[in-house]
From Swiss-Prot:
This is UPF0358 protein Bcer98_2651. Signal peptide: none annotated. Transmembrane segments: none annotated. Belongs to the UPF0358 family.
C-alpha cells in the first residue's frame, strides 16, 4: 500500500509539473505564432518568472524523489529549446 501511495504521488507530481511546463510552452508558442519581439520587457519578465518558478518546482520534486533528475532536466531542456527557436525565428524575421 505504501508503495502504491508513493507511485501515486510521483505520477501526480510529474503530471503537475508537465501541466506547468505546458503553460509556459503555450506562452512561447503564442509568441512564435505572432513573432512578437522576445525582447519586450513584459514578455521577458513573465517568461523568466515562469521558468524560474518551474525550475524551483522541479528541484523540489527531485529532492523529494518524486521525479528523477533526468526527467526534470528533460522538461526544462525542452522549454529552453523552444525559447531558442523563438529567438532564432525572430532574428531571422528581421
Amino acid at each position: 500500500m505504501a508503495s502504491e501511495t508513493v507511485t501515486n504521488h510521483q505520477e501526480k507530481a510529474l503530471a503537475l509539473l508537465q501541466a506547468d511546463a505546458e503553460k509556459i510552452l503555450r506562452l512561447i508558442k503564442v509568441q512564435m505564432d505572432h513573432l512578437t519581439m522576445p525582447q519586450c520587457p513584459l514578455y521577458e519578465e513573465v517568461l523568466d518568472t515562469q521558468m524560474f518558478g518551474l525550475s524551483r518546482e522541479v528541484d523540489f520534486a527531485v529532492r523529494l524523489d518524486l521525479i528523477s533528475e533526468e526527467q526534470g532536466k528533460e522538461m526544462l531542456g525542452e522549454l529552453e529549446r523552444e525559447l531558442s527557436a523563438l529567438h532564432e525565428a525572430f532574428t531571422n524575421k528581421k
